[in-house]
From Swiss-Prot:
Keywords: ATP-binding, Chaperone, Nucleotide-binding, Phosphoprotein, Stress response. It comes from the Bacteria. This is Chaperone protein dnaK1. PROSITE patterns: HSP70_1, HSP70_2, HSP70_3. The keyword Cell membrane does not apply. HAMAP family: DnaK. It holds the Pfam family HSP70. Acts as a chaperone. InterPro entries: ATPase_NBD, Chaperone_DnaK, Heat_shock_70_CS, HSP70_peptide-bd_sf, Hsp_70_fam.
Length: 665
């Protein structure tokens, strides 16, 4: 049986680690370095090169050398923004709307997962050489804010590389495992993970080998590459102003600018100023042109102000979700090479009073954590327990376009949640389960993860069939949804493994937008709820009228039936109007009319059990004719009177109104 390793699959660099003699070890690659550039390229002979070899041909062969591939994984073409496709190589959409990367040398199109699998395969080969043994499985890390499709696509890349994924592990959680390994103290830890292409922040409670994730937040469109782009744009704009040439339109020049920007960024972590020198960057009618620019830390910080602002919000959201104050944080762990930027470190110090931990290598700590998790799985490490969470809320679309959340964000995983829903129309033979991910109350403003149809539901009035919908998230954060018709036992299941994915900008703004538009959302929801409640009441009233016709005949309760019919007409008249007050009045009138009809039903039941009751009913009817406006004030449709258990089969009960519109599909 082969060994298991831990892999940090990064946007910029990747690292592989393993447990040896009970301790995590980072494995050097075949070139002798401990980090492998996440770059894949092809030579003129169509030979594939990976890592440092691919990096060396970036400038001379930009169209056949591919980096930042992690930004494409698990995403469709229409979800990419201008920043993602601003690369020197060709990125396009195929006829299915999927991202494809073109190599002129091989004359082939590649899926991002296929190219990333080459990086994984190199890491595995180097590890097998070091260990002298085969490797058949791995723990692979992903950003905490990766969605379901991105996680599944990462898993698919590993399968293409020929290995099994035993666990998809969130990067901040892996870093916390590395930090807390062999520590017996209890600490509240904030992991600040700013990598090359993504940003995550997680809050954990670490105590005696138990790693309990409390909250996570992030931005999958923010990383060190964004800081590089600020420098690239500054250089390019100055050159454009001087020479009227935009270097960003030249693939080779753009690659040289990007490398120079990254170098300047790194140098400014230890120096106050640096020089950017790019001879023969391009040519004009007057001859070759060069770049010679002074660039200092103060200018870099002024260019990056907006990026620092974007780092603040996820930290604040994570603190709010965890219920902790900044003063309760005992340790701050910095992860990712971009946390070496002085202004980033200074920002962290303003957020949390404690000095950041300097005892871990930000480039290797995630791989070490992945190796520790691999040791837990293999049994080489014991007495360690990891409790992770799901980063975004998961639910489904219900009648009126509302989002019904089944699993809220920051719920510990693995988890299973279920609820019972019903049909929104009479004799409805099927229901569509539309799975959504996000924080907005309106389903259309959350991201669709997939949908499926449960058919074969026996004909029945609206609200009678019972459909059990269950959401299952495994330890990898991968989702499976099932729907079961309780009457027939018919079941339909779908694993969320592709299709629609979260747009990076949507993820970045999702929680913040939900908060900023909470008032607008409440108004929209109240309008939908009023309309749905009115439709439900009409359905109840029509069913009660049919019962009355069977019980009393056409004239037995004529006055009460006529009152209900007129009240239904009033509700139908105002249901699509923009005047909520008129609708509320008409609904109230229908409730009163139904109450009168129900009183007549109750009176008839008493007649059946007591012959003298008929005399009382006669006087009661006379009273109704003379004092028809004097109805009781009790609400016959009080939600508390109609509570029932929805989910007793699954060990949790609900006290909600059984006609609550959240439960119609």
């Amino acid at each position: 049986m082969g060994q298991i390793v831990g892999i940090d699959l990064g946007t910029t660099n990747s690292v592989v680690g393993v447990i040896e003699a009970g301790r995590p070890v980072v494995i050097a690659n075949s070139e002798g370095t401990r980090t492998t550039p996440s770059i894949v390229g092809f030579t003129k002979n169509s030979e594939i090169v990976i890592g440092d070899q691919a990096r060396r041909q970036l400038v001379l062969n930009p169209k056949n050398t591919f980096y930042n591939l992690k930004r494409f994984i698990g995403r469709d073409w229409d979800e990419l923004d201008e920043t993602s496709i601003s690369v020197p190589y060709n990125v396009k959409s195929n006829d299915k709307g999927s991202v494809r990367i073109l190599s002129p040398f091989t004359e082939r199109e590649y899926a991002p997962e296929e190219l990333i699998s080459s990086i994984i395969r190199k890491l595995i080969n180097d590890a097998e050489t070091y260990l002298g043994d085969t490797i058949d499985s791995a723990v692979i890390t992903v950003p905490a804010y990766f969605n379901e499709s991105q996680r599944q696509a990462t898993k698919d890349s590993a399968v293409l590389a020929g290995i099994k994924v035993d666990r998809i592990l969130n990067e901040p959680t892996a870093a916390a495992l590395a930090y807390g390994f062999e520590k017996s103290s209890s600490n509240n830890v904030l992991v600040f993970d700013l990598g090359g292409g993504t940003f995550d922040v997680s809050l954990l409670r670490i105590s005696n080998g138990v790693f309990d994730v409390k909250a996570t937040c992030g931005d999958t469109q923010l990383g060190g590459n964004n800081f590089d782009s600020k420098i690239v744009d500054w250089i390019a704009e100055r050159f454009l102003e001087k020479h009227k040439i935009d270097l960003r339109r030249d693939r080779q020049a753009l690659q040289r600018l990007t490398e120079a920007a990254e170098k300047a960024k790194c140098e400014l972590s230890g120096l106050q100023k640096t020089k950017i020198s790019l001879p023969f960057i391009t040519t004009s009618d007057d001859g070759p042109l060069h770049i010679e620019e002074e660039f200092d830390r103060k200018l870099f910080e002024s260019l990056s102000d907006d990026l620092l602002d974007r780092l603040l919000e996820p930290v604040q959201i994570a603190l709010e979700d965890s219920g902790w104050d900044a003063e309760q944080i005992d340790e701050v762990v910095l992860v990712g090479g971009s946390t070496r930027i002085p202004m980033v470190q200074q920002l962290v110090k303003t957020l949390v009073p404690n000095e950041p931990c300097q005892s871990v290598n930000p480039d290797e700590v995630v791989a070490i954590g992945a190796a520790i998790q691999s040791g837990i799985i293999s049994g080489d490490l014991r007495d360690l327990l990891l409790n992770d969470v799901t980063p975004l809320s998961l639910g489904l679309e219900t009648i009126g376009g509302l989002m019904k959340v089944l699993i809220p964000r920051n719920t510990p995983i693995p988890v299973r949640q279920s609820d019972v829903f019903s049909t929104s129309e009479s004799n409805q033979s099927s229901v569509v389960v539309q799975v959504r991910q996000g924080e907005r109350p309106l389903a259309s403003e959350n991201k669709s993860l997939g949908k499926f149809r449960l058919s074969g539901i026996p004909p029945a009035p609206r609200g009678i069939p019972q459909v059990q919908v269950a959401f299952d998230i495994d330890a990898n954060g991968l989702l499976e949804v099932s729907a079961t018709d309780r009457t027939t036992g018919r079941k339909q299941t779908v694993s969320i493994s592709g299709g629609s994915n979260l747009n990076e900008q949507e993820i970045n703004m999702m929680i913040a937008e939900a908060k900023s538009k909470s008032t607008e959302d409440r108004i929209k929801r109240s309008v939908i709820d009023r309309k749905n409640n009115a439709l439900t009441l009409i359905a109840q009233a029509e069913r009660r009228l049919r019962d009355a016709s069977l019980e009393f005949g056409p004239y037995g309760a004529e006055r009460q039936q006529r009152a209900v019919e007129l009240a239904i007409q009033d509700v139908e008249e105002f249901i699509d109007d923009d005047d909520p007050q008129e609708l509320e009045i008409s609904v109230s009138s229908l409730q009163e009319a139904l109450f009168g009809l129900n009183r007549r039903f109750a009176a008839e039941k008493k007649v059946d059990s007591n012959p003298l009751q008929g005399i009382k009913n006669t006087f009661g009817s006379l009273k109704d004719e003379l004092f028809s406006d004097d109805y009781w004030d009790d609400d016959p449709w009080d939600n508390q009177m109609n509570s029932n258990s929805r989910n007793s089969r699954y060990g949790n009960s609900r006290d909600d109104d059984p006609w609550d519109n959240d439960y119609f599909l």
